[in-house]
Regions:
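Surface-exposed molecular-recognition determinants
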Residues: 2-175
Length: 175
């Protein structure tokens, strides 16, 4: 059925980990979706990042660009962007913390990740509940400027510390 999702991989964090990697991207489909929820760092005020994986290893080359709009319930909207980065920012720039009820949730769509001859790109929709109770959201995208390698997955990590217990990351094929 067109528009269906097939679960490929899921990681449920049962003890704090430095990173989570989802694998299973192959040449079967061109579009994949990642859903994450209840993502919280074990160190206060951290930003969540992502990197594509090549042969199961997160790519750390400075060939990633991203831009998005930050929508804040308690302040003016903001824009953020970066070129030639070694990672793509996922969560709100002010960071997610360890206070009760703070968490990040979101959806990414991945395009051309399985194509070795094309740039890979993603779209992002993410929401955060901050320690102040402010709801924030991000909407934007990023590009992985590598047209010589196919990607087989995607990894997530915080700028510092670990991803805490209870986070769920799921990779789907979009069919």
């Amino acid at each position: 059925m067109a528009g269906s999702l097939i679960k490929i991989d899921e990681e449920i964090v049962t003890s704090a980990v430095a990173s989570v990697t989802l694998t299973g991207i192959d040449s079967t489909y061109d579009v994949y979706m990642v859903r994450f929820n209840n993502v919280v760092p074990d160190t206060d005020t951290q930003t969540l990042f992502t990197r594509p994986t090549i042969s199961g290893t997160m790519d750390t080359n400075g060939n990633k660009d991203y831009a998005y709009k930050i929508m804040r319930a308690g302040a003016s909207f903001q824009n953020t962007s970066l070129t030639n980065s070694d990672k793509i920012e996922v969560s709100f720039i002010l960071g997610t913390g360890t206070s009760s009820q703070e968490m990040g949730n979101g959806v990414l769509y991945l395009f051309n990740f399985n194509n070795a001859s094309e740039y890979k790109f993603l779209t992002l929709e993410e929401s955060n509940l901050r320690h102040t109770g402010e709801l924030t959201g991000n909407q934007g995208g990023g590009v992985f400027k590598n047209n010589s390698s196919a990607c087989d997955g995607i990894g997530f990590f915080f700028a510092s510390g670990n991803i805490d217990v209870g986070a769920v990351f799921t990779l789907y094929k979009v069919v």
